[in-house]
Amino acid sequence: MACAAARSPAEQDRFICIYPAYLNNKKTIAEGRRIPISKAVENPTATEIQDVCSAVGLNVFLEKNKMYSREWNRDVQYRGRVRVQLKQEDGSLCLVQFPSRKSVMLYAAEMIPKLKTRTQKTGGGDQSLQQGEGSKKGKGKKKK
């Protein structure tokens, strides 16, 4: 245990991990959501979390091929993990407004809906409607 205490908080493997499932309002707490559903975001991606965190000035890097262990869907859309540096070499906070991992997650969930990629995706939802009704043909009752 003394070995872990001697390691610097500025090393990349000491950065906190944020998976998209932590912020996803489609997930239950058992499935991995870590913030209240009222503050969660619909299907966030790791790149969106990275964009938001790096824009505020946090030291961030993206690991694209990492998967959250509770994520059953192995699709590329659900892959990725973001590592964020919370503490500097001397143990002090990088940014005072982010004292904990939960504060970073809440901030990311608040800012992701304001991204340009999210605000421009509002059009084109009517394509799923079917144009015509098919005539009902089926087998009749068997005649005796």
UniProtKB/Swiss-Prot annotation:
Annotated segments matching region Disordered: 117-144
Q: Which GO terms describe its molecular function?
A: 7S RNA binding
Q: Mind telling me which Pfam families this protein's record contains?
A: SRP19 (PF01922)
- Supply the Gene3D superfamilies for this chain: Signal recognition particle, SRP19-like subunit
Q: Name one GO cellular component term.
A: nucleolus
Q: What is the documented function of this protein?
A: Component of the signal recognition particle (SRP) complex, a ribonucleoprotein complex that mediates the cotranslational targeting of secretory and membrane proteins to the endoplasmic reticulum (ER). Binds directly to 7SL RNA. Mediates binding of SRP54 to the SRP complex.
Give the protein name, as stated in the record: Signal recognition particle 19 kDa protein
Protein's organism: Canis lupus familiaris (Dog)
